[in-house]
UniProtKB/Swiss-Prot annotation:
Gene Ontology MF: a single term: tropomyosin binding
Disorder this protein is connected to according to its UniProt record: Nemaline myopathy 10: An autosomal recessive severe form of nemaline myopathy. Nemaline myopathies are muscular disorders characterized by muscle weakness of varying severity and onset, and abnormal thread-like or rod-shaped structures in muscle fibers on histologic examination. NEM10 is characterized by early-onset generalized muscle weakness and hypotonia with respiratory insufficiency and feeding difficulties. Additional features include arthrogryposis or congenital contractures, ophthalmoplegia, a history of prematurity, reduced fetal movements, and polyhydramnios.
Keyword tags: Coiled coil, Cytoplasm, Cytoskeleton, Disease variant, Nemaline myopathy, Ubl conjugation
Example GO BP: positive regulation of skeletal muscle fiber development
Biased composition (Basic and acidic residues): 168-182, 194-217, 498-516
Compositionally biased intervals (Polar residues): 183-192
Stretches the record annotates as Disordered: 45-68, 127-217, 437-480, 494-530
Protein's name in the database: Leiomodin-3
Family: Belongs to the tropomodulin family.
Cellular localisation: Cytoplasm; Cytoplasm, Myofibril, Sarcomere, M line; Cytoplasm, Myofibril, Sarcomere, A band; Cytoplasm, Cytoskeleton
Compositionally skewed regions (Acidic residues) per UniProt: 142-167
Length: 560
């Protein structure tokens, strides 16, 4: 007891000596954080759930507080989007006749299942009832045996024989029940077979089958086995995938367009084969891949294709599963392509995002040939930048066309000048030195080959000479036409002196004159509307008159 009392006294002294407030005040901020973390590990708050007691070991700062409702909404949205993707990738479409037959099959199957279940339940109930009866009889026999303990051994043997007979009867009943179930199933199958045969034997069904056979072309069925596959496609696109891929690889010059729009369940490997085959093709102008389930891998392959292809002008990849990364990759490779004029990538499954839109606007500056873009920008900034860049490209294309037209006109003029020089016998370049006028369109008519001469009257028979004499001979136009003669007539021009002319030095620009031209033109203000008095008129006349025209006037008597 003495030792225990001593220990308690020492603990009390230690508690009195230790001051926690002073110790905590002396600790630094880092030491306080360490102490707090250790205390949380040693003695966690019992009111918190287990998931929040655990220490957060992530270095990244949290983006926001935990929200259970937003997490549930996100999970529901992910589940719904996954279901929509599966429905879009594997659409289930049937023709009306197929839907009817499928409904009939389902109804017949339901009836068969219900009949089988009903028969099984009935037989099971009968078996259970028989077992209960047999158990009841055995219980009665046991009670009788207890009461009649003094009976002979013969009676015991008879009781054992009765038990064996009851077990055999139960087995026989179970076998009969199984046979009845099998017979019911066979009967159901026979009923369904009879119903299908009756439907086939009906005159309406026979007429429909005859119509279908008459609509089909036996030549097409014999030559092309893919005809049946194409006709059953619900999208309506009758493109033969294998045949078109073969033609693209062979670089068929007759194939100018490749349309794969709305074709269901195209494997990704085949899409990649199409895109890779387009790299070396030189004849296809339009390539359409709308609503075919293309993803980022197809987009990256398209970007590489645009980097190498030099013939495609329009590309359509609308209504697919391409994200912003794939679109940015395509736009990045457009700086190496100078033939694409139209690009459509609207209505994607995922939003591109603001960063992708700004990147598209930045990358489009390096391309000078794209004229149309099928996409609605969400941000106003990239939208304005892209519209300005497309108008710039259109202006450049217009200027290029105008230059080509001018060059074509110059070539035509040179051809006409060469024709003039050859026709007039001038040496080459003499027409320009003489300062001749520019060739006119009438010169082509002048230098056309002359019409054939009339036949010699000596070689013509006498019967045709009288007819030729009656008809007045028409002189050729190039001899009597005065306008063409005036154009061909050369003009007299003074010869240029060989001595170089004394050129005047260029006038220096006067800065004061330039400043005056930059000033706005002063407006002449109209005079104020004031009535002129006789005194003002007199003074005005005196100002505009001279002393020679003044008349001497005598002074009145009053003034004198």
């Amino acid at each position: 007891m003495s030792e225990h009392s001593r220990n308690s006294d020492q603990e009390e002294l230690l508690d009195e000596e230790i001051n926690e407030d002073e110790i905590l005040a002396n600790l630094s901020a880092e030491e306080l954080k360490e102490l707090q973390s250790e205390m949380e590990v040693m003695a966690p708050d019992p009111s918190l759930p287990v998931g929040m007691i655990q220490k957060d070991q992530t270095d990244k700062p949290p983006t926001g507080n935990f929200n259970h409702k937003s997490l549930v909404d996100y999970m529901y949205w992910e589940k719904a989007s996954r279901r929509m993707l599966e429905e879009e990738r594997v659409p289930v479409t049937f023709v009306k006749s197929e839907e009817k037959t499928q409904e009939e099959h389902e109804e017949i199957e339901k009836r068969n299942k219900n009949m089988a279940q009903y028969l099984k339940e009935k037989l099971n109930n009968e078996i259970v009832a028989n077992k209960r009866e047999s158990k009841g009889s055995s219980n009665i026999q046991e009670t009788d045996e207890e009461d009649e303990e003094e009976e002979d051994d013969d009676d015991d043997d008879e009781g054992e024989d009765d038990g064996e007979e009851s077990e055999e009867t139960n087995r026989e009943e179970e076998g009969k029940a199984k046979e009845q179930i099998r017979n019911c199933e066979n009967n159901c199958q026979q009923v369904t077979d009879k119903a299908f045969k009756e439907q086939r034997d009906r005159p309406e069904a026979q007429e429909q089958s005859e119509k279908k056979i008459s609509k089909l072309d036996p030549k097409k069925l014999a030559l092309d086995t893919s005809f049946l596959k194409v006709s059953t496609r619900p999208s309506g696109n009758q493109t033969d995938l294998d045949g078109s891929l073969r033609r693209v690889r062979k670089n068929d010059p007759d194939m100018k367009e490749l349309n794969l729009n709305n074709i269901e369940n195209i494997p990704k490997e085949m899409l990649l084969d199409f895109v890779n085959a387009m790299k070396k093709n030189k004849h296809i102008k339009t390539f359409s891949l709308a609503n075919v389930g293309a993803d980022e891998n197809v987009a990256f392959a398209l970007a590489n294709m645009l980097r190498e292809n030099r013939s495609i002008t329009t590309l359509n990849i609308e209504s697919n599963f391409i994200t912003g990364k794939g679109i940015v990759a395509i736009m990045r490779c457009l700086q190496f392509n100078e033939t694409l004029t139209e690009l459509r990538f609207h209505n994607q499954r995922h939003m591109l995002g603001h960063h992708a839109e700004m990147e598209i606007a930045r990358l489009l500056k390096a391309n000078n040939t794209l004229l149309k873009m099928g996409y609605h920008f969400e941000l106003p900034g990239p939208r304005m930048v892209v519209t300005n860049l497309l108008t710039r490209n259109q202006d450049k294309q217009r200027q290029k066309r105008q230059e080509e037209q001018k060059q074509q006109q110059l070539k035509e003029q040179k051809k006409l000048i060469a024709m003039l020089e050859n026709g007039l016998g001038l040496p080459p370049g003499m027409w320009e030195l003489l300062g001749g006028p520019k060739p006119d369109s009438r010169m082509q008519e002048f230098f056309q080959p002359p019409p054939p001469r009339p036949p010699n009257p000596q070689n013509v028979p006498f019967s045709q000479r009288s007819e030729m004499m009656k008809k007045p001979s028409q002189a050729p136009k190039y001899r009597t036409d005065p306008d063409s003669f005036r154009v061909v007539k050369l003009k007299r021009i003074q010869r240029k002196s060989r001595m170089p002319e004394a050129r005047e030095p260029p006038e220096k620009t006067n800065l004061k004159d330039v400043i005056k031209t930059l000033k706005p033109v002063p407006r002449n203000r109209p005079p104020p509307l004031v009535e002129i008095t006789p005194r003002d008129q007199l003074l005005n006349d005196i100002r505009h008159s001279s002393v020679a025209y003044l008349k001497p006037v005598q002074l009145p008597k009053e003034l004198a």
